[in-house]
Regions:
Chain A
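N-terminal secretory signal peptides and thylakoid transit peptides that target proteins
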Residues: 1-21
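Catalytic metal-binding/acid-base residues of hydrolase active sites
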Residues: 16, 63, 101-102, 137-138, ...
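Hydrophobic membrane-targeting alpha-helices
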Residues: 22-30
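N-terminal active-site segment of His-dependent metallophosphoesterases
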Residues: 30-112, 188, 210
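Extended active-site neighborhood of metal-dependent phosphoesterases/phosphodiesterases
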Residues: 38-48, 106-198, 216-235, 247-258, ...
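Active-site neighborhood of phospho(di)ester-bond hydrolases with catalytic His/Asp-centered motifs
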Residues: 59-60, 95-99, 130-136, 202-203, ...
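Short acidic, glycine-rich surface-loop motifs adjacent to enzyme active sites
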Residues: 194-210
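C-terminal/domain-terminus segments
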Residues: 303-331
Length: 332, 119
């Protein structure tokens, strides 16, 4: 017997690109019954928490310590982002920071100072939970030693309100790769979940060949995706490319957040990977700093150039009710 | 009988000895040496012919570098004192950007060179 599910009432994950980052809302149906309810119950048993509504923000690529022509304002955009997140009408429960928290330097003392400055600014966030992964500028020169000293492990997982979050490190081996050891850990980590479990992977580099000659790839990304693809509700959030991007590969959706320092151009249009020049009249334009309307689900953002609204809705996968993200065009 | 066998074996060895150096020289690929040093390659452009096998000899002058070019399936690393060799027979024409994909410092993102493959 085919089960009937109200696709829009199942679970909604909406993402609004703030420019300063991305705000997501996970909205599982409060009264989910039948197969969906059973799945939620199962998730509740696995994670100790049944999926319930919450919101979180993705921030990326602050490059604390960078101060050059593409952005002579240093940490101003990062600090502005913190203010904006704190001003959101609905307080997010979680921040995911997808790498390049700091800009690299070979002077260890200076890099340590940059790590401290990152922590000082990020602690101003009025958000109970902040989770990070490193970028190559944090961890590429020392195999992630200093990153781990300040921020802990670079790959790990945790559960939040029934959603399984996985932090993947694809920078600490200096090459753009996850590596066999971490892939084995990932496979084991995922094994306890049903195939319909909602999973959010956050990492620094794209896990697919977005633009390999700009180093926008992960060399063993296909092997990672082979581990993730049996799961029907996987979202991958990443940074590194300093611009919005949305890709759907199979049933997995990949989203990049903008940076907090400078933007890179569209690789399909620009001949070279050169930062978008700084505009002193509009210092945050290329970072897309935007104000968020109180009701971001139905109202447009102010001064926005590109808004993403992503919904997780119910979908049947091989007879199992799962979730799928749908990317909506901006409603401006 | 034993003497004939030894003589035959000697002739075979002699034939191989005489033939091999010429044959090896005739089929040895062209060697192109590329030096990697933060944050560039020297030379920064080489031109190859489609179907011609070449040997790229990579030498690092400072730290570990990568040498990555997805379309031609090149993914190599080179460390100081340990040159790397790549046998390459390009199967397609075009202009390709090869990058260092082993993070090597602040301007790592700009470390690249061009490989042109012509007919």
């Amino acid at each position: 017997m085919k089960k009937s599910v109200d696709r829009r009432s199942f679970l909604k994950l909406s993402g609004a690109a703030l420019g300063i980052g991305v705000l997501y809302q996970a909205m599982p149906a409060a009264q989910a019954k039948g197969a969906v309810g059973e799945m939620f119950d199962h998730m509740g048993k696995q994670t100790g928490e049944r999926p319930t509504p919450f919101s979180f923000v993705q921030l990326s690529d602050a490059h604390v310590g960078f101060n050059g022509p593409p952005d002579p304002l240093g940490t101003k955009a990062f600090e502005r982002a913190v203010e904006m997140v704190n001003a959101l009408p609905e307080r997010p429960e979680l921040i995911l920071f997808t790498g390049d928290l700091t800009h690299d330097t070979e002077e260890k003392d200076v890099h340590a100072q940059r790590m401290k400055q990152f922590l000082e600014i990020s602690r101003r966030l009025n958000v109970p939970l902040i989770k990070c992964v490193p970028g190559e500028h944090d961890a590429g020169l020392d195999g992630g030693a200093m990153y781990r000293e300040f921020l802990g492990e670079s790959s790990y997982s945790f559960d939040h309100r029934g959603v399984h979050f996985v932090a993947l490190d694809n920078v600490s081996r200096a090459k753009p790769e996850v590596g066999k050891e971490q892939r084995m850990w990932l496979e084991k980590d995922l094994a306890r979940f049903p195939k319909s479990a909602p999973i959010v992977v956050f990492t620094h580099r794209p896990l697919f060949d977005l633009k390999p000659d700009w180093e926008w790839f992960t060399s063993d990304g296909d092997e990672v995706m082979n581990l993730l693809s049996p799961y029907e509700n996987v979202t991958v959030l990443y940074g590194h490319i300093h611009r919005d991007d949305a890709h759907e590969l199979g049933h997995v959706h990949h989203y990049a957040a903008r940076s907090l320092i400078f933007a890179f151009p569209d690789p399909e249009k620009a001949p070279d990977k050169k930062p978008v020049p700084f505009d002193k009249e509009h210092p945050f334009r290329n970072l897309g700093i935007r104000l968020v309307h109180e009701n971001f689900s139905g109202q447009p953002l102010v001064n926005a150039a590109a808004i993403e609204d992503v919904e997780l809705t119910a979908r049947e996968f091989s007879g199992i009710n799962g979730m799928q993200q749908l990317l909506k065009e901006p409603e401006l | 009988m034993k003497g004939k066998v030894v003589a035959g074996a000697l002739m075979v060895v002699l034939a191989v000895f005489m033939a091999s150096p010429r044959g090896a020289r005739a089929s040895e690929p062209r060697v192109i040496e590329i030096h990697a040093k933060r944050f560039g390659f020297t030379p920064d452009q080489i031109t190859l012919k489609k179907g011609e096998t070449v040997k790229i000899r990579l030498v690092s002058e400072d730290v570990t570098h990568g040498f990555f070019l997805r379309p031609l399936k090149i993914d190599e690393e080179v460390s100081p004192g340990q040159p790397a060799e790549i046998l390459l027979t390009p199967g397609q024409t075009g202009t390709f950007t090869t990058i260092c994909d082993h993070f090597c410092g602040v301007n790592h993102g700009n470390m690249k060179m061009t490989i042109v493959v012509s007919e």
